[in-house]
Each structure stands twice: as structure tokens, then as C-alpha cells.
């Protein structure tokens, strides 16, 4: 689950992670009032969306007066902000964060994430703060420092000092940076976060260390034990179909292709998408119906796929283990009739009750294209949209 910058900073402050003073605004008048309340000669007007790279997209602006803050907020609110992380469609700005200006001496990058290669929480830091870290990682990977945390002992002060020295920090700032990292680690662990990024992390001219940004993502599988964090969820920032999928306990992620996919099992779903790409197509979604789906769940999954106007064909790829192929077939037939299917449908079934499932599809009277294997199914789906 992603949250907004202002929400991330609220959590930071609870753990003693230094942040600038800021006030949320949902209108231009609110922005003007916030700038007056902060009382600094310069304020920063920041668009609040669930994506990074806002600065380059025009979502972070300096204002030297409350009137200017009002005008900038007026321009941002309601705009479609496009960044490297939003895709070409962009995201609508519904709120802005008005923050005090600071005397910045240096901009750095600091991130905490789960490193699957080491199975450990890992700190990443770079002197290249304030720019796209993805670009730095691609062009200059040597500029990113990494420090893995032993789960048995947690984050140690020497690791903070090691990162600080690698970033070129000196004097009292080294200890301030170390304390900053320790507090961030506690927050990461306590909230079951999966990613925390601060870009930029700034060193003030007086040597202070402050989080000028906050990008926080939580592990959705752990939210059952963090009811307080659910209050931060902003459904307006999430894909409507993904919200609907959660209601049916479906794993659904919208993509930008035109071939809808319904598969059971995450591994098979990824293999299906890879095969579609391999034969020249583009998947419209990732959708795993799980191993114990019933007819109603399959119907809901089918309707979810077809709710995407970009879908020009549907590929169903099911290996029936726990899930029986005849149950899948019944769900496909029910959904196709209910939504009045108008796009080509390719179905590949294998496993438990496969012959019964194929018989149901064959006798359904629907225009269903059968396939005997994954590659053949992908080729038929791609051919159907060309």
C-alpha cells in the first residue's frame, strides 16, 4: 500500500525522523493560508500523488509569497501530473502540501528496501540526491552505496557511519545521519514497510539532516496487524479495478496492453504474460484467480478483465490442480453470457477434470477458441487482435 508524502512525514515524525514543517491544502485558498501560517520567506508547493519524479513533471514549485503559493496551488490542483513513474496517462492532483523552505547545503538520496538477493533489509544511499535514482542506478551504479542489515542484531551505528563516510559527510553531521538511519530503520520494521525512499535527503547549512521527501510503501500482507495504517489509504489514487479485485481476493494489476489474462497461480500468470510478449503481443493485466476459486470468483475475474476498454482479446490459461477445469469452464460461460462477450476468447485448460471442462466450453454455444498449450494459446490471442 502506497501513501502520500505528507502522510509518510507524519509517520517519520512519530519515530524522530526530522522533517520540515508542512501543512496540507486541498484548495488554492488553503494553500495561501498555509503559507501565511508557516511564515517563512520561501515555501514549497508540492503536488501529492502516489508517484515519484514530481519535480521534473512540474509538481514541486517554490513560492516567495502566500499569493504565489495560492497561484501555484491553483495551477496544480486538478492537473494531470506526468512523471517517469506515472506512465503517459499521468495522475490527477487532488491535494498539495505546503512546506517551509530550508537553507540546503547538500542533497542526497537514502532508501530502505527488502533485498531479495540477500533476504535482508538494505539501506541504499547516494550523493546523487534530487534526481531520478533509477537513472543513476542504470548509468552510474557505482554511485549507489549499499548496506545490508543482519536481522539478528538490527541496524548498527557503525553501518550508519560507514554510509555517512561514503557520502562524504564529516563532523557532527556523521552522528546526526547515523541517528537518522537508526530511526528510519525502527519505523521500517515497526510498520512492516516494504520500501522507504527519501529523495532528497538534505544536509542543511547548519549540519542538520532532514527528510525533504517521503515515499513509503507498506506490505499489504501485513496490514491486518496495522489497522491504524489503513487510515492512510487513498482510494482515489488507486486503480478502480484493483480495488474491486481485492473485494474478491483476486491478485490483479492493470497493465497497458490489449490482451486480458486470467490465470491461476502467480508463476503461471507471469509465464503467460512473458509468452504473449514473446510472440509479439502485449498483456493488459496480471490476474491470478488463486487455487481455490469458485464459479462466482471466476465470473468476477472475467468481468474485471472486460471492464478494461483496452482489452481486445482474452486469454484464459488454467492448470487445474486444486482448482478444477470444469469449475473454471462454468465460470467462463456464466461471465461470457452475463457481459455479452464481444472480444475473441482463447482458452487453454489442463489438469483436473480437463475433458469435462473442454466439453462444457464446446457445448456452450460461445465463440471460444481452444488451445492445447501455452505458446499456441498466446499465438492465437495475438493473432485475434491483429
Swiss-Prot record:
Swiss-Prot/TrEMBL cofactor(s): Mg(2+)
Binding site for substrate: 264, 321-323
One of the record's GO molecular function terms: ATP binding
Described function: Succinyl-CoA synthetase functions in the citric acid cycle (TCA), coupling the hydrolysis of succinyl-CoA to the synthesis of either ATP or GTP and thus represents the only step of substrate-level phosphorylation in the TCA. The beta subunit provides nucleotide specificity of the enzyme and binds the substrate succinate, while the binding sites for coenzyme A and phosphate are found in the alpha subunit.
GO biological process: succinyl-CoA metabolic process; tricarboxylic acid cycle
Record EC number: 6.2.1.5
Binding-site residues for ATP, renumbered to this chain: 46, 53-55, 99, 102, 107
Keyword vocabulary terms for this entry: ATP-binding, Ligase, Magnesium, Metal-binding, Nucleotide-binding, Tricarboxylic acid cycle
Assigned protein family: Belongs to the succinate/malate CoA ligase beta subunit family.
Keyword Transport: no
Keyword Signal: no
Subunit-level organization: Heterotetramer of two alpha and two beta subunits.
Catalytic class of the enzyme: ligase
Cross-referenced InterPro entries: ATP-grasp (IPR011761), ATP-grasp_succ-CoA_synth-type (IPR013650), ATP_grasp_subdomain_1 (IPR013815), Succ-CoA_synthase_bsu_CS (IPR017866), SUCC_ACL_C (IPR005811), Succ_CoA_ligase-like_bsu (IPR005809), Succinyl-CoA_synth-like (IPR016102)
Protein name in the entry: Succinate--CoA ligase [ADP-forming] subunit beta
Catalysed reactions, semicolon-separated: succinate + ATP + CoA = succinyl-CoA + ADP + phosphate; GTP + succinate + CoA = succinyl-CoA + GDP + phosphate
GO-annotated cellular components: cytosol; succinate-CoA ligase complex
Bound cofactor: record note: Binds 1 Mg(2+) ion per subunit.
Amino acid at each position: 500500500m502506497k501513501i502520500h508524502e505528507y502522510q509518510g512525514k507524519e509517520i517519520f515524525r512519530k519515530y524522530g525522523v526530522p522533517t520540515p514543517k508542512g501543512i496540507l491544502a486541498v484548495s488554492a485558498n488553503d494553500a495561501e493560508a498555509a503559507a501565511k501560517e508557516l511564515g517563512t520567506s520561501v515555501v514549497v508547493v508540492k503536488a501529492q500523488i502516489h508517484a515519484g519524479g514530481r519535480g521534473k513533471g512540474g509538481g514541486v514549485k517554490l513560492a516567495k509569497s502566500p499569493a504565489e503559493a495560492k497561484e501555484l496551488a491553483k495551477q496544480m490542483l486538478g492537473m494531470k501530473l506526468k512523471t517517469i513513474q506515472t506512465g503517459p496517462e499521468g495522475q490527477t492532483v487532488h491535494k498539495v502540501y505546503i512546506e517551509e523552505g530550508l537553507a540546503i547545503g547538500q542533497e542526497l538520496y537514502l532508501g530502505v528496501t527488502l533485498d531479495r538477493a540477500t533476504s535482508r533489509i538494505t539501506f541504499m544511499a547516494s550523493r546523487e540526491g534530487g534526481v531520478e535514482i533509477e537513472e543513476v542506478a542504470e548509468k552510474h551504479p557505482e554511485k549507489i552505496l549499499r548496506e545490508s542489515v543482519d536481522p539478528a542484531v538490527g541496524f548498527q551505528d557503525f553501518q550508519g557511519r560507514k554510509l555517512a563516510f561514503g557520502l562524504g559527510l564529516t563532523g557532527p553531521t556523521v552522528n546526526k545521519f547515523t541517528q537518522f538511519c537508526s530511526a528510519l530503520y525502527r519505523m521500517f520494521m515497526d510498520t512492516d514497510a516494504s520500501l522507504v525512499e527519501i529523495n532528497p535527503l538534505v544536509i542543511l547549512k547548519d549540519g542538520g539532516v532532514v527528510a525533504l521527501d517521503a515515499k513509503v510503501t507498506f506490505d499489504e500482507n501485513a496490514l491486518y496487524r496495522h489497522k491504524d495504517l489503513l487510515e492512510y489509504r487513498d482510494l482515489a489514487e488507486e486503480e478502480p479495478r484493483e480495488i474491486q479485485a481485492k473485494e474478491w481476493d483476486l491478485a490483479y494489476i492493470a497493465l497497458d496492453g490489449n490482451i486480458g489474462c486470467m490465470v491461476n497461480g502467480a508463476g503461471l500468470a507471469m509465464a503467460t504474460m512473458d509468452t504473449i510478449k514473446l510472440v509479439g503481443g502485449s498483456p493488459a493485466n496480471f490476474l491470478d484467480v488463486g487455487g481455490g476459486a469458485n464459479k462466482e470468483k471466476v465470473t468476477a475475474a472475467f468481468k474485471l478483465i472486460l471492464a478494461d476498454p483496452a482489452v481486445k482479446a482474452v486469454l484464459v490459461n488454467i492448470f487445474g490442480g486444486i482448482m478444477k477445469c470444469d469449475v473454471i469452464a462454468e465460470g467462463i460461460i456464466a461471465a461470457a453470457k452475463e457481459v455479452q462477450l464481444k472480444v475473441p476468447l482463447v482458452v487453454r485448460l489442463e489438469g483436473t477434470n480437463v475433458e469435462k471442462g473442454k466439453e462444457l466450453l464446446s457445448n456452450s454455444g460461445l465463440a471460444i477458441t481452444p488451445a492445447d498449450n501455452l505458446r499456441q494459446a498466446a499465438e492465437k490471442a495475438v493473432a485475434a487482435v491483429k
